[in-house]
């Protein structure tokens, strides 16, 4: 099956149009945490895609466990296993500790998972021709809020390094769904659905279009943006995007390290002066 982002977005939008009001048992006039609404909406998107793409839609940890079962059935050994190619593996591999207990303990879902949902082009799963890694974000139209954390910039730089240094053509896409909702009674109504491709967002001020992709170095080095507010103007290949992102990442990292080293030098000089005057060290 050929997967197209527009078709996936359309399936989700039509689902919410038909769904209408979603009762979440919210208490009236009470502030609710983002997760109180965001988590049920993630489940709604999962339901929408499961109906549109049956047998090809998984939560990330479900996809890993199904793939491991598939490899065992084929007589392959999952120990130290690579999920698909090395690039995809760097995004989804749960680590040696989680795999060492499999199958006695299945791979669990984690908050740090790259994707809420994984959509495959065919039943070969990670060995197939296309892997959609989909993360769901949501925001209340009635509130002003900061752009959410999207993913670790360090993780993204690592997958860029793998693809570029080993000449691996990405068979994966990083998609972000933004659900704009309004509260109503004890629930919400999703009024807007926007789906964007990470590798169509200009990582730098590319060709005079857009702004540099923002990396918050103070918040666990996270790429941050609101999916409904970014441009999709990057027109080169995925490999080109990864190269430009690496340029953005390394430039910002170099500037930050230089600043930290400069501050450290000033602090060490200050400490040395204090030590000489106080004679207590």
Report each predicted region and the residues it spans:
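Nucleic-acid endonuclease domains
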Residues: 1-113, 119-132, 138-281
């Amino acid at each position: 099956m050929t997967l197209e982002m527009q078709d996936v977005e359309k399936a989700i939008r039509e689902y919410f149009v038909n769904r209408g009001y979603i009762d979440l048992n919210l208490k009236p006039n009470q502030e609710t945490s983002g997760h109180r609404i965001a988590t049920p909406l993630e489940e709604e998107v999962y339901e929408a895609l499961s109906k549109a793409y049956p047998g090809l839609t998984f939560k990330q940890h479900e996809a890993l466990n199904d793939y491991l079962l598939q490899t065992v059935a084929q007589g392959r050994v999952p120990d130290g296993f690579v999920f698909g190619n090395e690039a995809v593996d760097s995004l989804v591999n749960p680590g040696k500790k989680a795999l060492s207990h499999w199958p006695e303990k299945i791979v669990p879902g984690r908050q740090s998972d790259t994707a809420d949902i994984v959509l495959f082009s065919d039943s070969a799963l990670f060995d197939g021709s296309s892997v959609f890694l989909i993360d769901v974000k949501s925001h209340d139209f009635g509130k002003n809020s900061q752009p959410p954390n999207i993913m670790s910039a360090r993780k993204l730089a690592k997958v860029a390094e793998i693809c570029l240094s080993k000449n691996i053509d990405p068979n994966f896409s990083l998609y972000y769904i933004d659900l704009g909702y309004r509260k109503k009674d004890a629930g919400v109504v999703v009024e807007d659905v926007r789906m964007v491709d990470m590798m169509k967002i200009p990582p730098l001020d590319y060709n005079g279009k857009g702004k540099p992709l923002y990396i918050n170095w103070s918040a666990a080095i996270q790429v941050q943006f609101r999916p409904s507010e970014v441009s999709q103007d990057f027109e080169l290949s995925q490999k080109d995007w990864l190269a430009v992102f690496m340029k953005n990442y390394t430039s910002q990292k170099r500037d930050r390290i230089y600043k930290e080293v400069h501050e450290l030098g000033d602090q060490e000089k200050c400490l040395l002066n204090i030590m000489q005057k106080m004679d207590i060290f």
